[in-house]
Regions:
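Extracellular ligand-binding/catalytic regions of CAZymes and related secreted enzymes
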Residues: 14-20, 203, 211-283
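Residue-level signal for short, function-critical loop segments
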Residues: 27-29, 98, 222
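Short, solvent-exposed loop/turn elements at domain surfaces
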Residues: 31-35, 201-202, 227-228
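Helical hinge/lid and interdomain linker segments adjacent to catalytic or ligand-binding clefts
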Residues: 35, 39-130, 282
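Catalytic beta-strand/loop cores that center a nucleophilic Ser/Cys/Thr
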Residues: 68, 143-218, 255, 269-274, ...
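A glycine-rich, often tryptophan-bearing local segment used as a flexible ligand/cofactor-contacting loop or short
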Residues: 99-167
Length: 283
């Protein structure tokens, strides 16, 4: 529910009262259709597995708003992310790998706009190289990687953070792809998780940022060749993350000329006014 409040310094401002959280799980959905090994873990797609897990865990946190979970994929018209659908979305979860370049820039633009207005964005695993993640962070987002069926130990370094609720000191995934530092991202607002891999590398595997009015969470695990999204700890992290990332406000910024709050005194001098009127299309 959105409660709109008059405000002289913004075109449109809303306080979000969370009665339900609308989530879209976006997946390029390529590997599952092309690779038997991946399809064995995710017969209906990674997006379907994540969506099902979110629905099952939705009521496990006392007082948490219920979830409305839907999915979208690359091959749908407008990648399933129309303006109308994004306008209703509170949190967008993004998984991509081999088809980053196929995502239309116009869709990236509208996702960016919604994050800046307040929509939450959760980027998973190889989504670190997606257009939208690199756009929001403004860096290359590169890292080291290795596929060697390694154990990953994920340490909870901020146990009081809402995304870490219900987890122990650490949890382990028996097989995962290694990601290693340096992870070329801006300094995060918070580092919630730190991963250690069997080969010796470490990686900042749970990071948060704020961009505009929206919250962003990057979560490292999730290589398509492994059943990572069936893991209960991973599912708990995602369930916590959607509650954390859900918008608190929804603000469409338009750089308006603001009327004075107080009566202005008459001035004895006159200056030339050089003003350029800008509309939303100019921003």
């Amino acid at each position: 529910m959105l409660a709109f409040l008059p405000h002289p310094g913004a075109a449109r401002r809303a306080i979000v009262q969370k009665t339900r959280i609308s989530i879209i799980v976006w997946n390029e959905f390529q590997h599952e259709r092309e690779n038997d090994a991946v399809r064995a873990h995710y017969p209906e797609g990674i997006h379907s597995t994540i969506a099902t897990a979110l629905r099952e865990t939705a009521g496990s946190s006392p007082g948490a708003p219920p979830l409305d979970v839907s999915t979208a994929t690359l091959d749908q018209p407008e990648h399933g992310l129309t303006e109308e659908r994004l306008a209703r979305c509170d949190v967008l979860i993004w998984w991509g790998h081999k088809a980053h370049a196929k995502v239309a820039d116009v869709v990236v633009d509208r996702v960016q706009k919604r994050v800046l207005e307040g929509m939450g964005l959760i980027v998973l695993h190889s989504g670190h190289f997606s257009k939208i993640f690199r756009r929001m962070l403004g860096t290359n987002c590169s890292l080291k990687w290795r596929e060697a069926d390694e154990k990953e130990r994920i340490w909870v370094v901020e146990p009081s953070h809402p995304i870490a609720a219900g987890l122990g000191e650490y949890f382990e995934l028996p097989y995962e792809e290694m990601y290693g530092e340096r992870f070329d991202v801006p300094a995060p607002d918070e580092t919630v998780f730190l991963s250690w891999f069997e080969g010796g590398e470490v990686f900042r595997s749970g990071l948060t940022w704020q961009r505009g009015h929206g919250r962003i969470f990057y979560f490292r695990p999730g290589h398509e060749a492994y059943p990572t999204y069936h893991d209960r700890n991973v599912q708990r992290v995602l369930a916590n993350a959607v509650q954390w990332a859900a918008p608190r406000v929804n603000i469409v910024d338009a750089c308006p000329m603001a009327p004075p709050l107080e009566k202005l005194s008459k001035k004895d001098v006159t200056f030339q006014k050089v003003g350029i009127l800008q509309g939303k299309k100019d921003l």
